[in-house]
């Protein structure tokens, strides 16, 4: 499934909301995690950087971050993107659960 199967305006609205969020909290993390499949990998990379930058202000446990990275990895495997697979495996290995 790709983002072409979804209403483009709704996808854009979610993307804009996440890009405009200065401080990410649990809601933004949940929204991102649950809507990963509607974004391309370039957008996911940028949004994951926002997650990483907000980790010190978010009240989440590492299991939530682990699930996000595991889901991103699944998408990277589907796209056969070896560079991103390596990148996110390194991130996954750094997480302490």
Predicted regions and their residues:
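Inter-domain helical "communication" segments and dimerization helices
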Residues: 1-97
């Amino acid at each position: 499934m790709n983002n072409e199967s979804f209403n483009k305006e709704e996808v854009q609205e979610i993307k804009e909301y996440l890009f405009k969020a200065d401080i990410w909290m649990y809601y933004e993390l949940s929204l991102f995690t649950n809507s990963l499949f509607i974004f391309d990998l370039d957008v996911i990379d940028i949004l994951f950087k926002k997650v990483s930058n907000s980790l010190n202000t978010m009240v989440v446990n590492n299991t939530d971050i682990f699930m996000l990275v595991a889901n991103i990895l699944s998408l990277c495997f589907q796209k056969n993107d070896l560079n991103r697979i390596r990148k996110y495996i390194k991130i996954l290995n750094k997480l302490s659960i």
